[in-house]
């Protein structure tokens, strides 16, 4: 596995001390290697790994199986940001006091999307940022290296990134012109449905916007409440949210900040 030296050292210590947690939450962006890291843990504890779904039926099936297995088994719940509360509450009962041979791993993009009661019973591992040197082992493309923070992201099509750059430039120009019309026109190029493959992926747009936001004029930057961006990032980490609508709302709020700053 590329990178993650501190996290690897942590699980080595767990193994040496015979203190591997029964419930682990791995937090990190898409492409950061959460599932790969989970497989490293499973191999370290010499357990059988099973990827489960997040529905209440599959959670209940997992619980039932966990009490009957006779060999070490690790159940993985992937992308649990959107796991419904009834599933989380059912899972809570078994992770509080795990059966003898059962381990549980949950992967999320944003740890804040997890119920506090779930989080308090798990051991949280946050995927570490990848250095430029580590990313160079997968690509030497400067565009990818500028916008990619993990190995998975380096698989992105460079043309998609360039299109996202162009769209971000249009948004920034709308901010400079204080034009809601131009802003909404730019937003029509955001992907609202999976079938709109000719439009810009919302997650990629946010990545490029965050990377370039400091290029805005100082006056504009000072009037922007960064909360709008952080809130949008949290929202789009949940698949149940309309990402395009969330970004549109964020951009409109930022434009209002800019206009209000001018008035004051």
What do the predicted segments below correspond to?
Residues 21-42, 60-77, 82:
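Conserved ASCE/P-loop NTPase catalytic core
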Residues 1-38, 43-46, 100-101, 109-208, ...:
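Charged, glycine-rich active-site and insertion segments that engage polyanionic ligands
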Residues 9-15, 55-76, 82, 86-94:
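Conserved alpha-helical scaffold flanking the Walker A/P-loop in AAA+ ATPase domains
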Residues 67, 86-109, 116:
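Conserved catalytic/switch belt of AAA+ P-loop NTPases
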Residues 52, 77, 104, 195:
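Short gly/ser-rich anion-binding loops that grip negatively charged ligand groups
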Residues 45-54:
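Conserved catalytic segments around the Walker B and adjacent sensor/switch elements
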Residues 2-5, 53-57:
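Conserved phosphate-coordination/catalytic loops
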């Amino acid at each position: 596995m590329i990178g993650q030296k501190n996290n690897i050292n942590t699980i080595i210590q767990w193994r040496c001390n015979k203190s591997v947690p029964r419930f682990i939450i791995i937090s990190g962006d898409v492409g950061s290697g959460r599932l790969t890291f989970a497989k490293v843990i499973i191999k370290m504890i010499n357990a059988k790994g099973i990827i489960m779904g997040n529905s209440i039926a599959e959670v209940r099936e997992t619980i039932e199986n966990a009490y009957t297995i006779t060999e070490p088994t690790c159940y993985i719940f992937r992308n649990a940001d959107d796991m419904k509360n009834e599933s989380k509450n059912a899972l809570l009962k078994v992770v509080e006091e795990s059966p003898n041979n059962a381990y549980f791993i949950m992967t999320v993009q944003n740890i804040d999307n997890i119920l506090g009661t779930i989080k308090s019973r798990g051991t949280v591992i946050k995927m570490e940022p990848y250095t430029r040197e580590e990313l160079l082992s997968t690509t030497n493309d400067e565009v990818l290296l500028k916008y990619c923070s993990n190995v998975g992201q380096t698989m992105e099509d460079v043309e998609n990134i360039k299109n996202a750059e162009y769209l971000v430039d249009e948004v920034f120009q709308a901010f400079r012109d204080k034009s809601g019309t131009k802003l909404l026109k730019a937003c029509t190029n955001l992907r609202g449905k999976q079938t709109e493959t000719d439009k810009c992926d919302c997650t990629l747009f946010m990545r490029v916007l965050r990377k370039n936001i400091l290029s805005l004029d100082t006056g504009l930057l000072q009037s922007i409440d960064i909360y709008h961006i952080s809130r949008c990032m949290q929202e789009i980490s949940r698949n149940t949210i309309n990402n395009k609508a969330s970004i549109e709302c964020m951009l409109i709020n930022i434009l209002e900040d800019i206009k209000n700053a001018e008035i004051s």
